């Protein structure tokens, strides 16, 4: 019996009936094309739809580059975005977590790809997410050259989704970080964070649960914002200010992105054996969100320091003779910079604290 001669109601199942709507996916692609084009840069044409994204490294102006790659996600911060129904900021977080890991190695981010997985595709939700990704790419100066949208019924609860990002950058071989001349007496600078960034949100969510507040409640630490809005403040992207400072003078020897694990886990990753970072904790202007989290959750200072950035999202190890130049270059790009300490001989721990954190 041909398909045309089958009795009504006896046609075969469709992919849409199984839970995957190809038309919704195509609609989303059409809606995000202008967002993708807004991330154009030398080396990328800003078009999507092919089987792979293209990038012309020569057009980007490098002579003898080393490619640097990073991938990351946003973690359980996504759960707050889902529950608060705010989806246009987590894309910035996704880009930030990847490109900040590139710039700490001295690399300029070139292009970015994303992975968006959900149980039931909502084109409007997807467009909101990609609008954030595009904004993050513009802030970082990298092109969004492709991605994957996966609709997987049965894998996620209704409304849930996950994100992953992939970034590739390049640096001239002689400008890679960390440098090999980090020495005792080098100065440690801290760049202010925009808030919690994208780490520690399992603890954040537990503290909010204990507080009895909801995502639509007034944020106790940020007048004029709901708790959801305040906690979803996007991760700061440090790429352009740091690249400007690196190019302005030869003063930056190492950079450390302060993510999960805080100071004690991230700073030692860029230090040579035998050296430790001495951090003056009272120098940190702790944002109110961290004081609220610490007090509401009864979290000890050392636990705060190994879970959150506590107000410092990026660390720079700087030649003492070039400190003023580096600070000036960063300040010119809008960064709030504080002198946090210095490099010292390592006896035991890779990070040594002086004083107390003002929580």
Swiss-Prot record:
Pathway: Purine metabolism; IMP biosynthesis via de novo pathway; 5-amino-1-(5-phospho-D-ribosyl)imidazole from N(2)-formyl-N(1)-(5-phospho-D-ribosyl)glycinamide: step 2/2. It holds the Pfam family AIRS_C. GO terms for biological process: 'de novo' IMP biosynthetic process; adenine biosynthetic process. Its EC number is 6.3.3.1. One of its GO terms (cellular component) is cytosol. CDD domains: PurM. GO terms for molecular function: ATP binding; phosphoribosylamine-glycine ligase activity; phosphoribosylformylglycinamidine cyclo-ligase activity. InterPro entries: PurM-like_C_dom, PurM-like_C_sf, PurM-like_N, PurM-like_N_sf, PurM_cligase. Its main location: cytoplasm. It is an enzyme of class 6 (ligase). It catalyses: 2-formamido-N(1)-(5-O-phospho-beta-D-ribosyl)acetamidine + ATP = 5-amino-1-(5-phospho-beta-D-ribosyl)imidazole + ADP + phosphate + H(+). Keywords: ATP-binding, Cytoplasm, Ligase, Nucleotide-binding, Purine biosynthesis. It is found in: Cytoplasm. SUPFAM superfamilies: PurM C-terminal domain-like, PurM N-terminal domain-like. It comes from the Bacteria. Belongs to the AIR synthase family. NCBIfam families: purM. This is Phosphoribosylformylglycinamidine cyclo-ligase.
């Amino acid at each position: 019996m041909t398909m045309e001669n089958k009795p009504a109601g006896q046609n075969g199942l469709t992919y849409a009936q199984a839970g995957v709507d190809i038309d919704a996916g195509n609609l989303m692609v059409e809606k995000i094309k202008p967002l993708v084009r807004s991330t154009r840069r030398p080396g990328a044409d800003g078009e999507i739809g092919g089987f792979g994204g293209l990038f012309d490294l020569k057009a980007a102006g490098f002579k003898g580059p080393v490619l640097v790659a990073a991938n990351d996600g946003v973690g359980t911060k996504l759960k707050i975005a889902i529950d608060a129904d705010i989806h246009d900021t987590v894309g910035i977080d996704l880009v930030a977590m990847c490109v900040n890991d590139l710039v700490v190695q001295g690399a300029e981010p070139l292009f970015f790809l994303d992975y968006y997985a959900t149980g039931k595709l909502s084109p409007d939700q997807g467009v909101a997410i990609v609008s954030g990704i595009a904004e993050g790419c513009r802030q970082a100066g990298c092109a969004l050259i492709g991605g994957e949208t996966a609709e997987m019924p049965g894998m996620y609860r209704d409304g849930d989704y996950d994100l992953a990002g992939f970034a590739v950058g390049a640096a001239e071989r002689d400008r890679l970080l960390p440098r090999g001349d980090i020495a005792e007496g080098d100065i440690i600078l801290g760049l202010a964070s925009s808030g919690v960034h994208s780490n520690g949100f399992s603890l954040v969510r537990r503290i909010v649960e204990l507080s009895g507040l909801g995502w639509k409640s007034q944020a106790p630490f940020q007048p004029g914002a709901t708790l959801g809005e305040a906690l979803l403040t996007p991760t700061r992207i440090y790429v352009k200010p740091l690249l400007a400072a690196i190019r302005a003078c030869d003063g930056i020897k190492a950079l450390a992105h302060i993510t999960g694990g805080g100071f004690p886990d991230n700073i030692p990753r860029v230090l040579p054996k035998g050296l430790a970072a001495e951090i003056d904790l009272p120098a940190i202007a702790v944002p109110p969100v961290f004081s609220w989290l610490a007090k509401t959750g009864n979290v000890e200072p050392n636990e705060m320091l190994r879970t959150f950035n506590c107000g410092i999202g990026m660390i720079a190890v700087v030649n003492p003779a070039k400190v003023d130049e580096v600070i000036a270059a960063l300040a010119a790009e809008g960064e709030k910079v504080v002198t946090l300490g210095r490099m010292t001989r390592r006896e035991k721990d890779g990070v040594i604290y002086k004083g107390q954190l003002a929580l």
